[in-house]
């Protein structure tokens, strides 16, 4: 009876009010989680540089996640089958071995109960060989995927987690002491239960830590992580009018956060056939694969490769892609015309010229265009110089404009990225445009200053995306240029060529100014007359 009375007395909220409360609760949880996590991570590193220590914190988080993920998956199945109170973590290893083959097929990996995070952590303080234990556990996890479809997703995943590094301590005992603190620190992070948390705790915490490490690392951080606000803008530009995407691709995927943004914007099952990316740096490549797992992307739903995208692209069999988003490295060197094979490469050949050896930016543009689906959109962050420089880059721009591939160019504010204050821009490309015009958007003032960087607010992003979708003239903000206008400007794609900046100088009223000057001159004359009178009186007295 009591529960019924409670139900009658309950005040029901509207959907909007309830959603608002849930969103506020999520934000509060997220903020609390972030503060606690950074405090733990910062305390754990001690005297070790945060940038060097990131692989240990992030790797330990991953170890905890896959342990809990596997445990909950098995426990849920057993409990649903009527085996109440079952706990895989307490199962003898020899009994668990019987389930290895089936679990590898379903989950892509297997961990023995004794090697689960919770059990290794429980024994860590008393394990004089903890470094060897962890090394063995990580090796076993990687080996468990061998021969399965998930092999490439797990191979070398823990390579950057060096348990014998002097960064952890000068002796085995000191290193193990640090490893115990690592396990306990990550174990104490309030990441909730994998099967029951109100925010995407593991993935959210991982991305927060990467943001903090990237911002503290400056230039090095910018090479592997695109700020969340820029990722949001790129992905929204690429998904205007769409509720689902076939495949998403990033040719310079870094830690993978930009790739994952499409799922956050469109929804969990909106990326039908998965996430594809390539990254040249092996440490960052490992961070990206871990990021996929922590966001609960199945091993059969992502394909991340570690190679030079321009010289050795790994996804020929997977292209074309409906959505391509990327923040490739700015103006790096590449082989260019030193490699005679590249001019005949189907990705670069159509332009008839290669990007300069000292500036590979246009090579990434051509690569992305080549692998773009006919119904797709590519949104690429670009160094501003490629929009106006002459030579080979101008010829490539001519090819892009003549063939009506450039849909929009957006000038971004300066100082949005970690480690560089450059005001970058975005080039949006499509293969089946509805018109032969190019939209130019000047978003240089669409930001707010946060500590040392500028940031795009949700309102800033909305305004840019809205202008992009409407393709209308907006004074001092957006201009829709036809082909003749662009070609007449020698294929210059700089936004400042097409969008006149607003004159923010104070307008001067000449009539009013002249009147003020006349008044000042008259007043000056009165003062002079008074001074002359005083001097004359002094002279008379003498």
Identify the residue ranges that each predicted region occupies.
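Conserved, well-folded catalytic cores of nucleic-acid-processing
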Residues: 43, 185, 189, 208, ...
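Conserved S-adenosyl-L-methionine
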Residues: 220-326, 331-333, 337-342, 347-352, ...
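Generic recognition of cysteine residues
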Residues: 6-7, 71, 118, 253, ...
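Non-catalytic, mostly N-terminal accessory regions of nucleic-acid modification and defense proteins
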Residues: 2-233, 237-238, 242, 300-312, ...
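A structure-centric signal for secondary-structure junctions around beta-strands
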Residues: 57, 202, 245, 272, ...
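A conserved structural/catalytic subdomain of Rossmann-like adenosyl-cofactor enzymes
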Residues: 3, 11, 22-24, 28, ...
